[in-house]
Design a protein with these regions (language model features):
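SAM-dependent transferase fold signal centered on methyltransferase-like domains
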Residues: 1-266
């Protein structure tokens, strides 16, 4: 979206250079990441966004990085209705949530569908760091039996509501628990594990082979520099995993990208 183009002549050129053209749209809410040097132009920026994005009713500015177990940021209302509860539509699925209180990344929609279309009816799938359900609900809709672990009690509530909303409540077991407790809680093995790991949670991959049947598939997400990837592949192979696919799926910081790994337990 061409946010900078909308503000030419409104925000001075030297300040406009500090504006990121990227922002999240979740349902009818837009979330910006404004440089402090743009504080004097918040109203103009938010108004331009509301004018150009007819589906957006509320604009927030993220004023802290992700923090706490809920992986949420403090949000500052810039314009609009001020309601942080919304419904996000993605490939025919509806996700209810409060963006001020739960984590959701609207830019992973393609990845969620890429993974979901690989799921076969009758599979047993484990989803860790499940959030409000975007990685759990599509596999259930394809006929999988899903166990979804999420540490945030509030996110679990939204996940259960979203499972009902999307007609898959009978195929999803929602468990409010730390992902690292999975082996103790779930004394069973799965056909597939879907793990959109938060930053700094890479050690979870060590426990995944023990949760899978032979031939089971892991979809794992991590944050790395490109030069780290070959070493990472070797470490996964040492765990008894064959890397089937490795792809970059978004930049998150200078020289740091989100990487998707599809791996098979051999």
């Amino acid at each position: 979206m061409r946010l900078k183009e909308w503000l030419v002549g409104v925000v001075p050129e030297e300040r406009l250079a500090r504006l990121s053209s990227r922002f999240h749209v979740i349902g009818d809410i837009a979330i910006l990441y404004l440089d402090p040097e743009l504080n004097g132009y918040k109203d103009e920026i938010a108004s331009a966004l509301l004018d150009q994005c007819r589906n957006v009713r509320t604009v927030f500015n993220k004023i802290t990085p992700l923090e706490g177990e809920r992986r949420t940021s403090r949000l500052e209302l810039l314009a609009g209705e001020g309601n942080s509860v919304t419904v996000h539509l993605e490939f025919g699925f509806r996700y209810h949530m409060d963006v001020a209180r739960v984590f959701f990344n609207s830019r992973l929609g393609y990845e969620r569908m890429r993974v979901a279309v690989q799921v076969k009816a009758g599979e047993e799938a484990l989803v860790l760091f499940a959030g409000v359900g975007p990685f759990a609900i599509p596999p259930a809709a394809r006929g999988a039996r899903v166990v979804a672990l999420e540490k945030s009690l509030e996110a679990c509530g939204w996940l259960a509501e979203n499972a009902r909303e999307n007609g898959v409540a009978e195929r999803i077991a929602v468990i409010n628990a730390d992902a690292f407790s999975m082996a103790a809680l779930l004394k069973r093995r799965f056909d597939r594990a879907i793990v959109p790991a938060p930053y700094g949670m890479d050690r979870i991959v060590d426990a995944l082979p023990g949760m899978l049947r032979r031939g089971g598939i892991i979809h794992f997400y991590t944050f790395k520099k490109a030069q780290q990837i070959e070493g990472l592949k070797k470490s996964y192979e040492d765990l008894g995993l064959e890397v089937l696919l490795c792809r970059r799926c978004g930049n998150v910081a200078p020289n740091v990208s989100r990487w998707a790994f599809d791996m098979e337990k051999i």
